[in-house]
Amino acid sequence: MTNIRKSHPLIKIINHSFIDLPAPSNISAWWNFGSLLGVCLMLQIITGLFLAMHYTADTTTAFSSVTHICRDVNYGWLIRYLHANGASMFFIFLYLHIGRGIYYGSFTFMETWNIGVLLLFAVMATAFMGYVLPWGQMSFWGATVITNLLSAIPYIGPNLVEWIWGGFSVDKATLTRFFAFHFILPFIITAMVMIHLLFLHETGSNNPSGLNSDSDKIPFHPYYTIKDILGLLFMVLTLMTLVLFSPDLLGDPDNYTPANPLNTPPHIKPEWYFLFAYAILRSIPNKLGGVLALVFSILILMLFPLLQMSKQRSMSFRPLSQCLLWVLVANLIILTWIGGQPVEHPFIMIGQLASVIYFSIILIFMPIISLMENKLLKW
């Protein structure tokens, strides 16, 4: 009699994906983030579901319903802060996961990489709409500013914005539809994650050397399940420390003031994980130019497979490319810092400089350095 794990139609799929999956023997802790992202997604869906049971998507009661969750619902404060800080963890892992993909050349799996970029867009859209739901000052003004960017689209822009708003300003209709989309998108993301994994399992995982590892595979379970559990423990420790000791560390105090269309906050800014893109948006004086730069700052990831000039896949043995990648990381940290600063001298200049450097590194310097390294190795 064959093992049910290998014969049952459904369990067989799980077996091939998480148990008997042949994995490279040398993948490092950088390969943990995929599973951590999966755990984050499940955590967000579960906590979000419980929050939705008590939340009301109406401009008059949204803010007070969130207050009610925190004060009156059993462990409501815990669920709410797990959800809010879980989003921050999600983005930390996303950025590390993408960074790993760039460093080790995982973007050569074109289908996996491109669906990953689409996943990033979907997660960003979900997070943005979720930030609007508590209906605080930053929720309202963030929604107004970001949706208003669409008015930069020639000809259809203004009509498009009013269509998204469901009226002539961000109001009840906007909040209701944002709640609907915020609820449905994580399930669409889950489906996209399955496609992401499907494409990945077509080729198998990459590894730190960037070489073909077909001759040296080990089963995913128990070797990498136990390794993923260690990563999970670190994640739980970090998240619970954040939630239980300083739950508002990454939030904005302005969001504890109910939304008021008649009073604009002095500094409108999104959550920390969008600040780098927000800085790029603000660094261009032209509205349409800024919007294009904002979209392209993420869309540029899709160009990585086309800009790969090196004969080696991974950066493990390419010190010049490594240096350049770390300059890019430092530049992104600077952009994140600038995005949270007021629009005044010297921050405007620093933001513009950092934006130019960001695009230059990816589009110009990385391919040139790769070609130089090929020459150094007489390739």
Curated annotation (Swiss-Prot):
Its cofactor is heme b. Binds 2 heme b groups non-covalently. GO terms for cellular component: mitochondrial inner membrane; respiratory chain complex III. PROSITE patterns: CYTB_CTER, CYTB_NTER. The cytochrome bc1 complex contains 11 subunits: 3 respiratory subunits (MT-CYB, CYC1 and UQCRFS1), 2 core proteins (UQCRC1 and UQCRC2) and 6 low-molecular weight proteins (UQCRH/QCR6, UQCRB/QCR7, UQCRQ/QCR8, UQCR10/QCR9, UQCR11/QCR10 and a cleavage product of UQCRFS1). This cytochrome bc1 complex then forms a dimer. SUPFAM superfamilies: a domain/subunit of cytochrome bc1 complex (Ubiquinol-cytochrome c reductase), Transmembrane di-heme cytochromes. It comes from Octodontomys gliroides (Mountain degu). This is Cytochrome b. Heme b b566 binds at residues 97, 196. Component of the ubiquinol-cytochrome c reductase complex (complex III or cytochrome b-c1 complex) that is part of the mitochondrial respiratory chain. The b-c1 complex mediates electron transfer from ubiquinol to cytochrome c. Contributes to the generation of a proton gradient across the mitochondrial membrane that is then used for ATP synthesis. Heme b b562 binds at residues 83, 182. The chain crosses the membrane at residues 33-53, 77-98, 113-133, 178-198, 226-246, 288-308, 320-340, 347-367. InterPro entries: Cyt_b/b6_C, Cyt_b/b6_C_sf, Cyt_b/b6_N, Cytb/b6-like_sf, Cytochrome_b, Cytochrome_b_C_euk/bac, Cytochrome_b_N_euk/bac, Di-haem_cyt_TM. Keywords: Electron transport, Heme, Iron, Membrane, Metal-binding, Mitochondrion, Mitochondrion inner membrane, Respiratory chain, Transmembrane, Transmembrane helix, Transport, Ubiquinone. GO terms for molecular function: metal ion binding; ubiquinol-cytochrome-c reductase activity. One of its GO terms (biological process) is mitochondrial electron transport, ubiquinol to cytochrome c. It is a multi-pass membrane protein. The gene is MT-CYB. It comes from the Eukaryota. Heme 1 (or BL or b562) is low-potential and absorbs at about 562 nm, and heme 2 (or BH or b566) is high-potential and absorbs at about 566 nm.
